[in-house]
């Protein structure tokens, strides 16, 4: 019989997220979610760029996987700024399509991951992948709408201020109305800041809330705001520990992946010689595939040299190397995703125990609900015990003479 897991019910439990993130079911879900996200972005951008609504090319999303973390951040920021800054209606529409699609993907994937993490941490139970996906499917709309509730709140108060500004277009009367009602605009501004900032901080608790409680989007939002506001110091401590430990774990995983890629290229290159060097140089012109944050800058000679592959077999080799390294790098990012969901689930349970005094092992179980439903008659009345059944079925036998 294996040793039971040590659960301390304090910030040290966050260190368990590293091992929890390596659950094959979570890694599969994270990998599938990233693949679906990249595919969704490529398809949407390709479609709308063909319609001339946007000028962004779909290869930017593939490069985000290939490049290192610091390269990813700069490329992503520059790409988003180039798309968002003009505020063209078509570009805003495309961004909205992308966001809603990604939210639907990660509502399903994130819901399943946090469900597995909740049962793993709270009750040390291993739920099968099919059950986790079934739970995420049932609660999909709750997962989907919970992050949107703060956005809707900010948008509502923003629209109120816009309407007030439209009234200000009326000559004389409108200016007087805006002058007298401007304090309400300031209050709306404060509410937008409050709802937006606290909602962004508590966003990490919304999926774990639904996975642990089996509740809806409103309960997820209320708990997210309550936990951040009730224990801000504890919340910040947990998040700081989570961030530092997560970065350290991701650095280790990224270093192992980088070293694996470099050793594979180096040892195969010893045997293959100049051919593999040409393939590496050709690929390096497109992206620095072996870089995971631990490589030096590309030399000027490598940047200026132009390498072309003449034979189809070398091009095939280059393409397959790209596919293999893309898969490895995607696995690194999938670990980051599964770690994030696992750690946030642990933090949710810790804060729930401190604020609501709820036992950590208290998790919503569908089996209990099904048993309660099965124990209830079709009319909604509880089934009586066996002795009561006899009294109801044979009321006229009481006091009757026994048969001779």
Give each language-model segment a name.
Residues 179-184:
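Membrane-embedded alpha-helical segments of small multi-pass membrane proteins
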Residues 1-178, 191, 196-205, 210-247, ...:
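Helix-coil boundary and N-terminal low-complexity module in membrane systems
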